């Protein structure tokens, strides 16, 4: 029984108010992330097709309107230096920069900067104003441009309006309509805290999240060697990447470089891309720290209703323009902050730097023995000394970063090219394959991080060919469960977060996937060898230029085996192609390897995450609903698809047949379960009356009888009339997973992305 969670404050006594289940049982398995971004929250009907709407957009007119906005300063939020470029670059960067490679979550693909918690992060102070400046343009073009696309395109246009040649831009990011609860942003409960993500981190502040000038006075013990918790890519709760004052506010550029390298690396950036992004972004605009943070009001989610979504009201002076407080730092990097120059590197290496304080009390650096020549953002008669952030100096004082920075100083063309490419990658890393990309500015050069696929340059197989290939596959003598396991292993790498993985490309035959333990490499090699022979024979005999890819044959093998096991027809859509090893970034794909995969009874939980939580996490990446999760696990078990061929969860007397036996036997009240491994991971089911052993199962199996919501679903499939529905639903869910990465089949359908 849970302990009383009442905190003696009165909650709203209306629908949705009061003590919730999570208050009573905070460790309860939650399925909420499997119910997000559905039609219930989407104001558009299913008929709305964002890709079609985007194609009807007057793209050039939109870009002109955005360009005009850059210098159309508004009295309610005036533009620094008469140009909003720096603000909009930051908006785009902070939208896309939440991406992390470990699970593909974050990024700009959902337009989540509009929602909590991102809209109220300390690092996003004043971006509420940036989005409001954009509203008249969004209002004008309506559904033809999503917020997700508009925020990133605006950053691109900002760069172009200040003389920078960008690498290109692709649209195609449908909006979502609610806060995404799937991303783990950290376990801290105060802004700027990091005590949960680092072994010796610090608690944050209870205020509004502006940089504290006193932060660096804390005791810091591990800033030169600490390890950031996975999957996080930010050093503090509420920051996009690192503390600009230095680790935990400590103004140490070398230690800051370590944090930079880790966090940018977890956003899929290497050292050159990291240096280019920091220096390129800091070529423009300024930071804002006109006065201490105690002048700043509540963030948007905590602000009063009359603020209408604005936050961080500022009582210092006018509260805007020269009196703006954003980060608490007050730095203008270059003499020409509204133009593309190489001045960031010129000043970085020209001057020696000494530590100083911003008007808000934050640590920053000022050039020694320099004359004031940096322009003021609002007073043409006022000049400033050159200033830098601790994290800027990291690009000079870290040996690896310094080498790149000096090269960029001497070769401005290399700097411009590196920044253009890194910026494009930042904005598009979670876009998925090019079949999702829209617009007239898609670059012709194909980049390795796109996980490129060869084009489909031949006629695809027809129904007669499909039937013949299925017969050939079954004639190989491969056990059906091996064919099903291989097809599932190939397709289930897909991540709806960043649209990576999936069966298309047949990358399961390439490094690193071919060697993953979860894929049972010995069995995989056997199956792939036989399927490659089938593919080769067909392609040698086919006429009219017709071919079949191994990617298609792998999926077709699973389909053939499933049809044999279920006695029903299973859909199949050809058209996949085969990627090469040269088109596959091994290091990047290593992040797709599962730590635990409950669908195949692989791996288990730890002292932080339970096995069943990993299962739900994986189901979310596969864009599954709770019923789809249940029916797939139940079906894969009776089909014998455990990664190692074990009997765990195979609750049937007729393995290999697609029956609802998993649910029937799991729900049998005559079975008594006990833990047998001493770790709470493996269990044995015995007949209550005789004590005879009947089954073994894992947490990923027993959760469907233990968890009240999953049990409710299991009871549907385990009922006397559940078999027909079970088979129908399993086949539908199977087909969905096999085609998760086939954006070429129905490009852009629906207003919401596959999440």
From Swiss-Prot:
SUPFAM superfamilies given in the database record: Heme-dependent peroxidases
GO molecular function term, any single one: metal ion binding
Reactions that this protein is recorded to catalyse: H2O2 + AH2 = A + 2 H2O; 2 H2O2 = O2 + 2 H2O
Enzyme class, UniProt record, top EC level: oxidoreductase
Sequence position, cross-link Tryptophyl-tyrosyl-methioninium (Tyr-Met) (with W-93): 241-267
Family matches, as PROSITE patterns: PEROXIDASE_1, PEROXIDASE_2, PEROXIDASE_4
Keywords: Cytoplasm, Heme, Hydrogen peroxide, Iron, Metal-binding, Oxidoreductase, Peroxidase
Subunit note: Homodimer or homotetramer.
Summary of the function given for this chain in its UniProt record: Bifunctional enzyme with both catalase and broad-spectrum peroxidase activity.
Name of the protein: Catalase-peroxidase
Organism: Podospora anserina (strain S / ATCC MYA-4624 / DSM 980 / FGSC 10383)
Gene symbol of the encoding locus: katG
